[in-house]
UniProtKB/Swiss-Prot annotation:
This is Succinate dehydrogenase assembly factor 3, mitochondrial. The lineage of its organism: Eukaryota, Metazoa, Chordata, Craniata, Vertebrata. Interacts with SDHB within an SDHA-SDHB subcomplex. InterPro entries: SDHAF3/Sdh7 (IPR008381). It comes from the Eukaryota. Its main location: mitochondrion. Keywords: Chaperone, Mitochondrion, Transit peptide. Belongs to the complex I LYR family. SDHAF3 subfamily. It comes from Bos taurus. Pfam families: Complex1_LYR_2. The keyword Chaperone applies. Plays an essential role in the assembly of succinate dehydrogenase (SDH), an enzyme complex (also referred to as respiratory complex II) that is a component of both the tricarboxylic acid (TCA) cycle and the mitochondrial electron transport chain, and which couples the oxidation of succinate to fumarate with the reduction of ubiquinone (coenzyme Q) to ubiquinol. Promotes maturation of the iron-sulfur protein subunit SDHB of the SDH catalytic dimer, protecting it from the deleterious effects of oxidants. May act together with SDHAF1.
């Protein structure tokens, strides 16, 4: 791999992690783990697959950047992140990718327990 390619991958990786800072903490953690895993998994991808990988992640970063800006401008409304996947894109996925997407969806739609604090009736010593 060329130095230019490696530089492009690292810059994109850092940009995505920076963009994740605007997400709610649970989604940030989930997104960070997913990005790290995907970038690690594609370290040895062929040039054609690597280019497609980068294009998709650059599109993700662009959408997230736009949504973060909209969220800042409309601070009175609840922030909304993400987009629906068109059927054409889903048809391009391999079975393994569909499974990963399903796991990601289940993880992302779990009830938010971050602020679910229950008081213990037992005194702490």
């Amino acid at each position: 791999m060329s130095a230019l390619h490696v530089s492009r991958v690292r810059a994109l990786y850092r940009r995505i992690l920076l963009l994740h800072r605007v997400l709610p903490p649970d989604l940030k953690d989930l997104g960070d783990r997913y990005v790290k895993d995907e970038f690690r998994r594609h370290k040895t991808a062929g040039s054609k697959e690597a280019e497609r990988f980068l294009q998709e992640w650059e599109a993700y970063a662009a959408v997230l950047w736009q949504q973060a800006n909209e969220s800042r401008q409309n601070s009175t409304e609840k922030a909304c992140f993400g987009i629906s996947l068109p059927e054409e894109k889903l048809n391009d996925f391999r079975d393994e990718q569909i499974g990963q997407l399903q796991e990601l969806m289940q993880e992302a739609t779990k009830p938010n327990r971050q602020f679910n604090i229950t008081e213990s009736r037992k005194p702490k010593l």
